[in-house]
Amino acid sequence: MKIPLMMVIAAMPLGTLCAADVLPLPEKVACAIADKQAFQQPDRVHLTGWIGSRMEASAKNRLAKINPDRLLMSYEHRPGCQSYDGEHIGKWLHAATLAWVNTGDPELRKKMDQVATGLVKWQLEDGYLGTYNLDGKPWARWTEWDVWTHKYNLIGLITYVRYTGNKELLPACQKMGDLLCKIFGDEPGKLDINTSSAHVGMASGSILEPMLQLYRLTGEKRYLDFAKYVLRAWEQPNGPKIVSVLLEQKRVDKVGNGKAYEMLSCISGITEMYRTTGDPKLLQVCLNAWQDIVSKRLYFTGSTSAAEHFHDDFDLSNTNKVAETCVTVSWLQLNMHLLQLTGESRFAEQLENTVFNHLFAAQLPAGTAWAVFTVMEGKKVYYNSNSTPDVTCCLSSGPRAVALIPCLASSVDSDGVVVNLYDAGTAKLTLRNGKTVVLTTETIYPSDGKIVITVDTESATPFAFKARIPAWSRESTVKLNGKPVKVDKGKDGYAAIKRTWAKGDKVELNFKLEPRVIAGERSNIGKIAIMYGPLVLAADEATLGKEGLPIGAISIGKPDLASLAIKPEPAPEKVKTWPHALVFHCNVIASEKPQEIRLMTFADAGSFEESYKIWLPLSRNVLVDGTETRSRKGDGTGSIIDENETSFVNTSDGTWPKEDWFAVTLKEAKTISRVVLMHGKTLNVGGWFDTSAGKPRIQIQTQSGGEWKDAGELKDYPATTGDKAGPLKEGESFQCQLAAPVEVFGVRVTGKPSFGGNPNQAFSTCAELQAFAK
């Protein structure tokens, strides 16, 4: 995998296929709210730069190579091999159809036809198109992921029908919709949609989105009535209270059980309900959710969620199941909806951040595989068709996001054309007055900040050319036909040039690409991250120098830009994933000696089977070279000095001592001023420190083999008792700042163990014990 990546991508000639040039089936019901920015058909925008290379990799190496028999297997042989196995075919149809419209690939179209007709073949007479059995072995109908599967079958088939014009499959969609209307509702004898799936009904409730699409496509009011029922059901005592909580508390972590993917899927449905009915409070629901995520729950890499859920404010783990790819995709979709509905550039800003960083970081550059979680440090674990399980939810979701990119990369609004994402390529746009404008973009962005866009019109035409000026760009210039022009941002956040345009007019944008240092906060105190333009950078063992340095050896001596001396340079062949890929020179400290290393983009980091890290410590954890011990051996196999917060040790041995401790001793004295403890795991029979007798204490050895002396306590450790862990979370970190720097031969944390629901024993756990000079 390490060497052939560039060979695989280079072998895919961009632009060799022509767009499908389709005319989608029109909707019979007009939306109450017209989009301010128009969703573009994928054949209108062709991207050939870095984004385009990732799109083509996804289309050719994943979507076109899927085995239709695998997608249909769980329908042919009910029940499915996974409880959610039925979702994959609808997700694939959605992504493949969009990709086919963009490329016109005839082989992909053949496979789409085969899959779509093959799926409908297994629809039962009553309209059922899931993978569950009536006898409930092993899954009973209308439980777990059954409605969810119908959601994705509707999304996939509706997309296929609209773009191919194959109306013969529309009745299958209506039969599904009619069955759902018959089964669920608040009338006597019908099932409650809240109790028909996991996650407080949010999985089944996400059927809202395609039912509204089905309503607008067919004009059948019963589908709108069903959608209104779903909204009512959410507010019942057993419902997730999505609308009321987001209007009143404005916190996504308080909605339902906080499950991010399902919740964001429901919120996308709410955008469709607002678009369909015009109820202004529904838009406010979505804006409140967006603002809460952006301000308190978003990784700066452009995704959200940890362990698949929204958590307390700023609770963003670096390693614990970070940013499920399904959540990344749903976050991108929400921003696309809000960009359409409001026309505001702040949503396009989020799109760029997500696409260039966390979305592409989850995708193997060759397009063949996707990560389920994409951690901020560690290794990426990719899944493809040869993985076990052979199809994960994220492997099916990722290509959907990639296929959606051209739909809003460029767009039109009531003023003219809008450019949201920058990549080489062309966009053929139709103004509101019916005239055609073609934009041809020449750039190697984001490797260079120069972007030249040629505007071609059928005749001299007045309209506004709107460009998104990235928020990170401190210096931006705009030229029109070679001459500088001053443009101010409008209320929508875009810089607009309003004039009568002629064929061949050129707009030149220059954004100053420069490094930025991001200071770590909360659990990342004592660390920095580095960005270059829109790109998040990472240290990867694949580019750490001839010595093959381990990632744990790297620290930042001085965090100012002058000392770091970050400079872009062409990527070496072994890590070049597209022709203009860059790596970035950076001065660091490696094993306490000055060292030059090369950083790479987060999007590419980890794709060469090596460990990587985004947050770089200002000083090295001095305990990683030590020897760890604990008060009792316990029954775990982890470590407290492996720099992995998901690995932990415990002291469980069936006894109940007054105190537990975890220690690391050193052969040579090291100067420290700060100690960090990361909690291990909270179990129903203990695993935490009981603070009823006092907060956990930090102790040190100032002589080799000497006595342990108290040096401070973990004041930020939460209030707990022997049987209650309080708000403690797995991998949560706590810090003790020492009164003054001190030379030590050992560090340990000491506290009272907990017993949970078994008072006949007590134990504690620890994921990491760290000590730093700064």
What are the language-model segments listed below?
Residues 6-16:
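Bacterial N-terminal signal peptides
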Residues 21-106, 110, 139-163, 201-222, ...:
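Aromatic (Trp/Tyr) and acidic
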Residues 227, 286, 348-357, 362-455, ...:
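C-terminal beta-rich recognition modules with glycine/proline-rich loops and embedded aromatic residues
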Residues 464, 506-508, 746-748:
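Short, conserved beta-strand segments of beta-strand-rich sandwich/propeller modules, principally
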Residues 642-714, 728-774:
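Aromatic, loop-rich ligand-recognition surfaces of beta-strand-rich domains
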